[in-house]
Amino acid sequence: MHVAVFGGTFDPPHNGHLAMCLLARELLHIDKVILSISNNPFKLLRSDHDDHRKNMVGLLASELKKTELPAEVSGWELQKKTPSYTVELLRFLRTEYPDVQLTLLVGEDSYREFPLWKSYEELVLLCRIAVFRRVPPEQIAHREQRLEMIGNVRFIDFDCPISSTTIRADIASGRPVTAKIPSAINRYIIDHRLYRD
């Protein structure tokens, strides 16, 4: 079994997150995705907004299940009372899933800072890493292969201009975001009046 681990703040989850998971299934033959809601390592107090993030990630998992990709939400990092780091999450998941292939999904920006991550050398022993690198769509269309492998790291060409930061700004400014987030998450944001200020 091949399990992808996709961590993030998911504030909010959006169509880019959905597309990354589906592309990972297509190119890496993923059987299941674990969506781990990350804490800011410098913010130790939980807030009501963490519950909203967890609920929205649950809706993202439901969207993935509609495509027949099993998805599970992990709140392990949110429950910790100490700063959480990716290597700790992977150690935990390795005990939960001792006999599966784990692949960590990361964006290109995060991967550039990889040598600064806590115990980054151990990470490549605990899992494979799939890096979604930004490539303009016209370049993707002319490449024979969207997947490149170097050692334990897979580089996947990916073009998605959507970001949680711009979605929050759009909502605060009253601009529509229906093309950027799944409809169930959009409804949740409206119902709970999130990102209004």
Swiss-Prot record:
Protein's gene: nadD
Pathway: Cofactor biosynthesis; NAD(+) biosynthesis; deamido-NAD(+) from nicotinate D-ribonucleotide: step 1/1
Function as written in the Swiss-Prot or TrEMBL entry: Catalyzes the reversible adenylation of nicotinate mononucleotide (NaMN) to nicotinic acid adenine dinucleotide (NaAD).
UniProt catalytic activity: nicotinate beta-D-ribonucleotide + ATP + H(+) = deamido-NAD(+) + diphosphate
Keywords: ATP-binding, NAD, Nucleotide-binding, Nucleotidyltransferase, Pyridine nucleotide biosynthesis, Transferase
Classification via Pfam families: CTP_transf_like
Organism per entry: Chlorobium phaeobacteroides (strain DSM 266 / SMG 266 / 2430)
GO molecular function: ATP binding; nicotinate-nucleotide adenylyltransferase activity
Keyword ATP-binding: yes
Name this polypeptide is given: Probable nicotinate-nucleotide adenylyltransferase
EC code: 2.7.7.18
Superkingdom classification of source: Bacteria
HAMAP family attached to this UniProt entry: NaMN_adenylyltr
Recorded family membership: Belongs to the NadD family.
GO biological process, any: NAD biosynthetic process
InterPro entries reported in the protein's UniProt record: Cyt_trans-like, NadD/NMNAT, Rossmann-like_a/b/a_fold
